């Protein structure tokens, strides 16, 4: 008899992940989607994880971060602010599936699936 580990088809649940997708903004970024597995910096600075060379975006504008299974957005002292569903972000803010985060004039859709 052999010893080993096997999976029975359909028994393992797919783990949910948070993704952020650019919906409105520079043409070259529209449709870009990334899975959030750690802190994600959004800004104009080339060292950012999502680099947006558009007006109204600061060098280090905002940060997506995970706390357990929850995703948060935090404004990093940007000049033009960050919004969630049209409301200004004043402190780290918990996000929900399908929320829209606005950084400058760029809209980023958040999904949990």
Residue positions per predicted region:
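Intrinsically disordered, low-complexity acidic Ser/Thr-rich regulatory segments
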Residues: 1-53, 65, 102
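Residue "hotspots" at secondary-structure boundaries inside conserved domains
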Residues: 32-34, 55, 74, 87, ...
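Amphipathic hydrophobic-ligand
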Residues: 57-59
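Short, conserved beta-turn/loop elements at beta-strand boundaries and strand-helix junctions
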Residues: 67-70
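Short, basic/aromatic beta-hairpin or loop at an interaction surface
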Residues: 72-82
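C-terminal boundary/linker segments immediately following FHA domains
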Residues: 83-113
């Amino acid at each position: 008899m052999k010893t080993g580990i096997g999976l029975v088809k359909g028994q393992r649940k797919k783990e949910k992940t948070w993704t952020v997708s650019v919906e409105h903004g520079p043409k070259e970024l529209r449709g870009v989607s990334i899975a959030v597995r750690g802190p994600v910096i959004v800004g104009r600075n080339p060292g950012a994880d999502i680099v947006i060379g558009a007006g109204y975006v600061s060098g280090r504008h905002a940060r997506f971060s995970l706390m357990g299974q929850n995703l948060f957005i935090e404004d990093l002292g940007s000049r033009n602010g960050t919004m969630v569903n049209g409301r200004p972000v004043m402190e780290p803010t918990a996000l929900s599936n399908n929320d829209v985060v606005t950084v400058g004039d760029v809209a980023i859709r958040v999904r949990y699936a």
